[in-house]
């Protein structure tokens, strides 16, 4: 039975195709349209489907929508409609207002008919947003039982769900409703500090430069820890649904930062305090989960689960022995969760498919790649061992675009759509930030490390699979040897690389290790202010306009591109 899951209501639109419980394909719409997050979250566009991602999934399986038995959407329109009953600071016709929520609901309801027009003849399902997040975390995990925490901005009316999983059953045991939302708190602080609502990674990177002390008490006025793992937020100050930072300005005694203004020590201190209270809240939730559910396994999803600093705290806290985090923890992952919920809860499917990697996106043949090389006027050669060639270039301080195999599903580049560099040189970080990626200097870079050497280079008390997906931060043992991948706080957000899961990438890092004595490389996403590259054409276009030294694409090494 083919089951398709789709996420389309807000942002990070995506599709995932499952066959008899096995994940066949999953991709985000942004990778095809080249528009970050696919679309903004608005009340007037929830019916816009990820048609390119759907088309890719079907093509990968060699089927059409007529062959799909079930489609699940990761939203419950009726429950979401009740948002206008929540007292809030809203703009008429927008989120939270009766007119806005009615528009959102009515347009959502057109989705089944749209799918019918595309050829779908099976059964359609509306599904709980946070239950889809939870399903995406538990069903691909290696556990037979687990506590599951899903935390983000908002789903229908909730921001956080705690669930208990056993076998193929996944049961919600509690929710925390809006406006108690860690995800929205991060969005609000990000915009207050002059970034966009999608810039949580920038805020997290900046936090390491600050001291939480000066502003921690200010956040304590905003946030209260409550019994049973709950928490509350003062939306009278935050005003999540209004373009209004006056409450935060009064609280912090600091005017909102304009995007062009300098980032100051006060801004860094505010982000450090935000990170500290996020750690407190998530530890509070996880402690309750451990004590109430009686399991030593924890699964996580939702945008908050992309916070590698908090994940490092949770991993070291001791409440759980094993941690699994869905690599597509953001809303795109709910497409996967929707498909798996239908397979297990509706169809009663017993088979589970452990998700040990995230390589479910498009891949391209050597013929596809060489056609693109010729079309772009590339200066290239075919090499016998691309991994060895790339390792030698990295050891010579070159920056290499690395395009191999199937694209990753999720926001992290995990060795198939990556920019690689030598971690030993501090100048590498500055060059990548300023000349290649065109981003802020305070943002760190991550290392990909051979799994068999990870504990020699990082303080990993309890290994967890989340490190395979670059989702946990650990303290570096030898920061002076790898300064380009160690943040100012002495930690690194590592990706552990296994030979059996990505042999070509493992061989590259092994080659670099033999040359330099360092079993890791700098790995950042292959993009420049746009979505991660998907196709050979995307890779060549980014290579041409960026200051990347070489492009290793399939078995081909590209030195230059002369035309588009």
Role assignments for model-derived ranges:
Residues 2, 7-36, 42-45, 87, ...:
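Flexible beta->alpha loop and helix N-cap segments adjacent to enzyme active/binding sites
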